[in-house]
């Protein structure tokens, strides 16, 4: 079984309630960075058993799955025990024994279509067999130059004219859509700041950048998935999550 298959099996236990399978897949000292859950394999297994006992069943719909070295990253829609659909990016790290040893994620409520009629999950599904390192390089440089604001003069150079498919819930397609959204935010005094990027994971023509910063003054984590075409940024999906108050954390591992 590939690591990607193992990760999909693990999230499937939220539906099946198969705690035995979850235990087999997880390293005992599993490190959890979702701050709403305890750390360790036992805490994960407890969540599986709790969801299995709920009168409203959990649903899991994986949309995209990728692998990069010892990490798998997934784009999935969850509905935990009928609490409402959430769009998530999950990252799982595998240890030398092939066990799932660490997990990071970002979740956001599923929203209505954006100004261009796209959802948070639709769009291109096919993955092209191109050099992941080229993809990683383009996305890493874009995140630094543009999202972290280190060289904003290069903004337009990352796109093929105004061709850019946008899945952010509030922004329209095109470079022009980004410009209009930033202008509207500025008028409202809203700043979106990327301070540090922790991961840029790549598989084929897709790369997921994981960053921290702030949105409208609140500490925020940003998961941005990009599809690269002919060396240009062609499509974007994202999940932003406000960092929970530390007093509510169920583990002390931090978001990263």
PLM region descriptions:
Residues 1-256:
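C-terminal and inter-domain tail/linker signature
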């Amino acid at each position: 079984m590939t690591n990607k298959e193992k990760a999909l099996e693990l999230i499937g236990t939220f539906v099946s309630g198969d705690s035995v399978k979850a235990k087999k897949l997880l390293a005992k000292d599993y490190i959890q960075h979702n701050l709403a859950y305890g750390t360790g394999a036992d805490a994960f297994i407890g969540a599986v058993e709790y969801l299995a006992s709920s009168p409203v069943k959990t649903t899991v719909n994986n949309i995209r799955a990728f692998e990069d070295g010892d990490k798998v990253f997934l784009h999935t829609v969850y509905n935990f025990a009928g609490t409402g659909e959430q769009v998530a990016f999950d990252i799982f790290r595998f240890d030398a024994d092939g066990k799932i040893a660490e997990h990071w994620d970002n979740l956001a409520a599923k929203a209505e279509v954006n100004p261009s009629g796209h959802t948070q999950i639709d769009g291109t599904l096919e993955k092209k067999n191109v050099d992941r390192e080229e993809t990683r390089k383009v996305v890493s440089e874009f995140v630094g130059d543009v999202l972290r604001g280190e060289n904003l003069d290069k903004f337009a150079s990352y796109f093929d004219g105004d061709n850019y498919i946008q899945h952010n819930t509030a922004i329209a397609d095109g470079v022009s859509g980004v410009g209009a959204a930033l202008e509207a935010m500025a008028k409202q005094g809203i700043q979106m700041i990327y301070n540090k990027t922790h991961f840029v994971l790549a598989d084929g023509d897709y790369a997921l950048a994981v960053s921290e910063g702030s949105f409208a003054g609140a500490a925020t984590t940003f998961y941005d998935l990009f599809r690269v075409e002919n060396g240009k940024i062609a499509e974007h999906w994202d999940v932003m999550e406000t960092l929970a108050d530390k007093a509510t954390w169920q583990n002390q591992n931090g978001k990263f």
